[in-house]
Amino acid sequence: MTRVAVVVPVYRNAATLEALVARLGTALAGRDWRLRLVVDACPSGSAEVALRLAATDPRVAVTGLTVNGGQHAALRQGLADEPDADVWVCMDADLQDPPEAVPLLLDRLGAGDVEAVFAGRRGAYESWLRRVTGGLHRQVAARLTGLPPDAGAFLALGPAVRSAVLAAPASPSVVLAVGVARRPVTSVPVARDVRPEGRSAWTARARLGQSVRSLWWALRRR
């Protein structure tokens, strides 16, 4: 049976972790799966919830980072910490990435003609301004790397793409690292949900800085 590792960065997500585990368990019933929660030096109680879940469910493991490196550094660490899987899924902890879509990504990856499958972003899941600016970023990323123009950080990836991501530790973005690897990828449309709790840790300034750094990194590798 294919071994699936789901890698999730955690920062200020204490309120959604229990639901995340429960919904993944339902969505992945009948599959061999494991959840790697990467707590990104979160000061607000997420680590305690993650450790409690790991203590009661052997499918849940926790990586605790002592320095906050951001979403993409946490994803990279989580991928590195799950070497025994056959396929990997990266997703957010805030439930905007619906766990019920994970089998869709895995099944498309299992068709064998691509090495990564992105959840193509759909829906009114954040403010119009964030959707517009995020869409512009993804359009430029697509022009630079050949990524699908709706690609975000909810994706399933195979061994070659995981290796490419881990071989690019300086990349500010796991998504752009996948694009620069020039492996065959695709996307399937997935409606994102409105965040049920809290707000994004990404401020407008942080989003802009991340976009500029990651696009410049990709441009230099064309």
Model-derived features with residue positions:
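Catalytic donor-sugar/metal-binding loop of nucleotide-sugar-dependent glycosyltransferases
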Residues: 170-171, 175-193
